[in-house]
């Protein structure tokens, strides 16, 4: 956006869902979940030509629960962000806005999500895999290979346990299945086989029998 656009009003503002300068960029919600962050924030900042580097007008801290996926965090952030925006506009109109410069310590960047990131690596820990599933639940969906097709996993559970089977091995029973990972097993709950609708694992397995 050209600097000339920013100079038309008193200044332009931006809603950003992260604790800046952590996760500057296009995908802060997904990146924060994928990284296993326990909390984030909704910030109202001044827009500048530099990426997400504007001064802070308002902020609201927000916990990221272990069950929250990117879509759910987005919805919570949008609701809080709309309220903060109205508050910020009111402060600006009254001349009471006191913007604080961002620190440049701890800068990280939230690059756009690439489809190449979405394949699950079961050599990773259960927590890392669940974070990937939660972070990509909205788009594009974390996936594994199942009988030669992509199987997206949108919700899963992890149980930490020792096992002596191959990493990535799928263990099926009547109503569920688990996949061995580095330090336990991943149990998918909501899935979507390539070319099919999203469904529970129980319904999926009924169709396989």
For the regions a language model picked out, list residue spans one by one:
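Sequence-level motif detector for i,i+2 pairs with an aromatic at +2
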Residues: 39, 53-54, 115-117, 148, ...
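Alpha-helix N-cap/helix-start motif
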Residues: 22-26, 122, 197
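Active-site-lining helix/loop region of Rossmann-like oxidoreductase modules
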Residues: 90-145
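Short, surface-exposed, charge-dense and proline/glycine-enriched linear segments
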Residues: 2-12, 32, 47, 73-78, ...
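Donor/substrate-binding cores of folate-linked one-carbon enzymes
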Residues: 1-109, 116
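Short, charged low-complexity intrinsically disordered segments located at boundaries
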Residues: 61-64, 107-123, 156-165
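An anion-binding loop in the catalytic cleft
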Residues: 123-209
């Amino acid at each position: 956006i050209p600097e000339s656009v920013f100079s038309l009003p008193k200044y332009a503002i931006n809603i950003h869902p992260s604790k800046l300068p952590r996760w500057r960029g296009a995908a802060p919600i997904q990146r924060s979940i994928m990284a296993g962050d326990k909390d984030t924030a909704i910030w109202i900042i001044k827009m500048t030509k530099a990426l997400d580097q504007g001064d802070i007008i308002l902020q609201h801290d927000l916990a990221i629960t272990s069950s929250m996926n990117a879509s759910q965090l987005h919805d919570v952030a949008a609701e809080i962000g709309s309220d903060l925006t109205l508050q910020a506009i009111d402060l600006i109109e009254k001349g009471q806005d006191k913007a604080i410069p961002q620190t440049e310590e701890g800068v990280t960047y939230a690059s756009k999500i690439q489809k190449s990131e979405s394949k699950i690596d079961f050599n990773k820990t259960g927590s890392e895999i669940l974070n990937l599933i939660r972070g990509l639940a909205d788009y594009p969906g974390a996936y594994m290979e199942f009988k030669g097709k992509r199987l997206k996993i949108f919700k899963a559970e992890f149980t930490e346990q020792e096992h002596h089977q191959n990493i990535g091995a799928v263990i099926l029973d009547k109503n569920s299945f688990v996949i061995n990972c580095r330090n336990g097993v991943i149990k998918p709950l909501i899935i979507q086989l390539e070319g099919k609708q999203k469904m529970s694992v129980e319904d999926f397995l009924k169709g396989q029998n």
